[in-house]
């Protein structure tokens, strides 16, 4: 059984766009590369042909994987989410209890995580530790280098 993944509308659109690009642009290009290499003569010693066939195989594997992910993708209905607790798609302002540093994160599905833009996965140690907490609560989170304590200062939705 395949794993169900949850996506925002943007994340699901990106997944669909990538899949369509691979099918409509990259797949025909891979076929053309094979045809071009085949036209160059003897296939038994044609490294270009072998490379093109291998690239096509990798592309088809990627397409199959994305089709499976897309088939098991579920859209998150943001209107149904409780704003009093930290959930997926929550914007959370937290304060590190040991150094007083404040940080803002948005909790997202694993496939949409991007630390550079402040999006952390709900399956990451910090994401797991914050889930279900309310404003004012202290989350004790075990990370590879010890335990961190974060106070939940604010929970909002976009």
From Swiss-Prot:
Mind telling me which InterPro entries this protein's record contains? Answer: GreA/GreB_C_sf, TF_GreA/GreB_CS, Tscrpt_elong_fac_GreA, Tscrpt_elong_fac_GreA/B, Tscrpt_elong_fac_GreA/B_C, Tscrpt_elong_fac_GreA/B_fam, Tscrpt_elong_fac_GreA/B_N, Tscrpt_elong_fac_GreA/B_N_sf
Q: Which Pfam families match?
A: GreA_GreB (PF01272), GreA_GreB_N (PF03449)
| GO BP | DNA-templated transcription elongation; regulation of DNA-templated transcription elongation
The coiled-coil segments of this chain are: 47-68
Quote one Gene Ontology molecular function term.
RNA polymerase binding
Keywords carried by this UniProt record = Coiled coil, DNA-binding, Transcription, Transcription regulation
Q: Which family does it belong to?
A: Belongs to the GreA/GreB family.
| Function, in words | Necessary for efficient RNA polymerase transcription elongation past template-encoded arresting sites. The arresting sites in DNA have the property of trapping a certain fraction of elongating RNA polymerases that pass through, resulting in locked ternary complexes. Cleavage of the nascent transcript by cleavage factors such as GreA or GreB allows the resumption of elongation from the new 3'terminus. GreA releases sequences of 2 to 3 nucleotides.
The protein's name in its UniProt record: Transcription elongation factor GreA
Instruction: Record the organism.
Output: Flavobacterium johnsoniae (strain ATCC 17061 / DSM 2064 / JCM 8514 / BCRC 14874 / CCUG 350202 / NBRC 14942 / NCIMB 11054 / UW101) (Cytophaga johnsonae)
The lineage is: Bacteria, Pseudomonadati, Bacteroidota, Flavobacteriia, Flavobacteriales
């Amino acid at each position: 059984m395949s794993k169900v993944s949850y996506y925002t509308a943007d994340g699901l659109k990106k997944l669909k766009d990538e899949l369509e690009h691979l099918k409509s642009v990259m797949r025909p290009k891979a076929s053309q590369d094979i045809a071009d290499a085949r036209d160059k003569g003897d296939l038994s010693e044609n490294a270009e042909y072998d490379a093109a066939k291998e690239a096509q195989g990798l592309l088809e594997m990627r397409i199959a994987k994305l089709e499976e992910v897309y088939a098991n993708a579920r859209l998150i209905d943001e209107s149904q989410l409780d704003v009093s607790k930290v959930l997926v798609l929550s914007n959370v302002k937290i304060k590190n209890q040991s150094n007083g540093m404040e940080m803002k994160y948005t909790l997202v599905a694993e496939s949409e995580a991007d630390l550079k833009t402040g999006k952390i996965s709900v399956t990451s140690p910090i994401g797991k530790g914050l889930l279900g907490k309310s404003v004012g609560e202290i989350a004790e989170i075990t990370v590879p280098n010890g335990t961190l304590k974060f106070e939940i200062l604010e929970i909002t939705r976009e």
